């Protein structure tokens, strides 16, 4: 039953909650948060060597496709579903989401990438940003949490709103992709920012789709990117772990 109240919302309390949520998101999804994202390229390293990515235009096109038709949308959807299951206290649903998210990863190195970051995110959250009930929700999953599921669980346990959490997560993922590419192509700082600007609409569109998606909407059509993550495993000279 929906409960309503005529009591006014205290603007000061609302501003404080919004500031606290923003502070947490900026901390958790900052490059300084030690989840090790800098050591992974999500297959971009192989794509650069193969000549698929050579400049800002080809990088922006590659990442736009990854966002809308590949791991970007899938990870965003898993984050949303994990957040909602955690918020509702649905441990069985969360376990199913965590297992499916892990199974959806297309290669061994991408599995290493997302599970190691997820584990680090949860470990640091427990140590420095703990929340009542977090341990129980993580334990209920009975499987290592991939990165987007870990972010969704922690954000929900802290009461950080879903929409900004999702946008911040996608921004962080895209920024890490661009950072990896900037070292490989290479790109200057200004060109890297130009790519980020070009992807602003794609990030927003991916987040909007994920917020209304269900697990039945999951799917990927980024065959070249998936192949890149597989071939990176045997790439002779590598800077990154994926």
From Swiss-Prot:
Q: Name one GO molecular function term.
A: nickel cation binding
Q: What is the lineage of its organism?
A: Bacteria, Pseudomonadati, Pseudomonadota, Alphaproteobacteria, Hyphomicrobiales
Q: Which GO terms describe its cellular component?
A: cytoplasm
* The protein's name: Urease accessory protein UreF
Residues crossing the lipid bilayer are: none
Gene3D superfamilies xrefs? Urease accessory protein UreF
Assembly, in brief, is:
UreD, UreF and UreG form a complex that acts as a GTP-hydrolysis-dependent molecular chaperone, activating the urease apoprotein by helping to assemble the nickel containing metallocenter of UreC. The UreE protein probably delivers the nickel.
| The keyword RNA-binding appears for this protein | no
Family statement: Belongs to the UreF family.
* Domain of life (superkingdom): Bacteria
Q: Give compartment(s).
A: Cytoplasm
What is the originating organism of this protein? Bradyrhizobium diazoefficiens (strain JCM 10833 / BCRC 13528 / IAM 13628 / NBRC 14792 / USDA 110)
Role played: Required for maturation of urease via the functional incorporation of the urease nickel metallocenter.
Where is this protein primarily located? cytoplasm
Record keyword ATP-binding present:
no
* Keywords, in A-Z order: Chaperone, Cytoplasm, Nickel insertion
